[in-house]
Amino acid sequence: MRIRFTKMQGAGNDFVVLDETRGTLGLTAAQYRFLADRHFGVGADQILTVRPPSKGAAEGVDFQYVIHNADGGEVEQCGNGARCFMRFVREHHLTDKDTVRVETLAGIIEPRMGADGRVTVDMGPPIFEPARVPFDTAGLDPQPTGSWHTWHLALGTHADSAIVSVAVLSMGNPHAVQVVDNVDTAPVARQGPLIEHHPRFAQRVNAGFMQVVDRSHIKLRVFERGAGETLACGTGACAAVVAGIRLGLLERRVDVQTHGGVLTIGWEGEGHPVLMTGPATTVFEGDIEVPELP
């Protein structure tokens, strides 16, 4: 099967974008993995699919936004991808609106195209209840910090174990954020997989490593669930800033420096949505022959 694709990136987080507004391609998990493969496919952190609203979608929804990780699994949300989604539907003349309502597994989001070409996404309010992350707190005691708390997680075997302190929340997908002294030397490669697959996270988790530079500036690395460390993670940036605000470390508007670029995150507090602003760029377009894979 030969398909048309668009390669895009937002702050270095890269995507293959597929247009299914005129009909579904019916790709399997193995075929999504093929497209994401950097040696045999196109190469991407995630595969993003544009579809019409689903049956029973809320009134006023313009599109459905479907996300598959590089491992082929479907996930709830991707912030950097949402910005690329907005640029895609504008550049491909699927809408002429500056703001669209988009249906995801995590709920409705509203990307907005700015006059400067950057895209702002209303990511909705963060979720703090452990059961909704989901995060199993049985036998754990919260560690009060600022106006919130963190949790101690044991990682690794007895011979090579560590205790890390993480703030746990959901931005439509689960995040565990820890504050580190130096993000460049943080043990992302070692601890990231252990946190991602920690048994207390039933759906696995994105592991964030945040260095607070000052109250309006952080540096961030994220080991993404199903993708590994990426150059940037939009929901990870949102989760880190929200955690930092609740822990008393950050102001309401923060620039997040990732390896791929800068994202600006704003949050006014409990019950308010998180707003994420950043770049979205088309890299190239093409066609690829996708083999029949189960």
From Swiss-Prot:
Main subcellular location of this protein, as a coarse class: cytoplasm
InterPro entries linked to this entry: DAP_epimerase_AS, DAP_epimerase_DapF
Residues bound to substrate: N13, Q46, N69, G79, N80, N173, N206, E224, R225, G234, T235
List of catalytic residues: C78 (proton donor), C233 (proton acceptor)
A cellular component annotation (GO) from this entry: cytosol
Source taxonomy: Bacteria, Pseudomonadati, Pseudomonadota, Betaproteobacteria, Burkholderiales
Recorded name of the encoding gene: dapF
Associated pathway: Amino-acid biosynthesis; L-lysine biosynthesis via DAP pathway; DL-2,6-diaminopimelate from LL-2,6-diaminopimelate: step 1/1
Subcellular localization: Cytoplasm
Site entry (Could be important to modulate the pK values of the two catalytic cysteine residues), positions: H175, E224
Naturally occurring in which organism (per UniProt): Variovorax paradoxus (strain S110)
Protein name: Diaminopimelate epimerase
EC number: 5.1.1.7
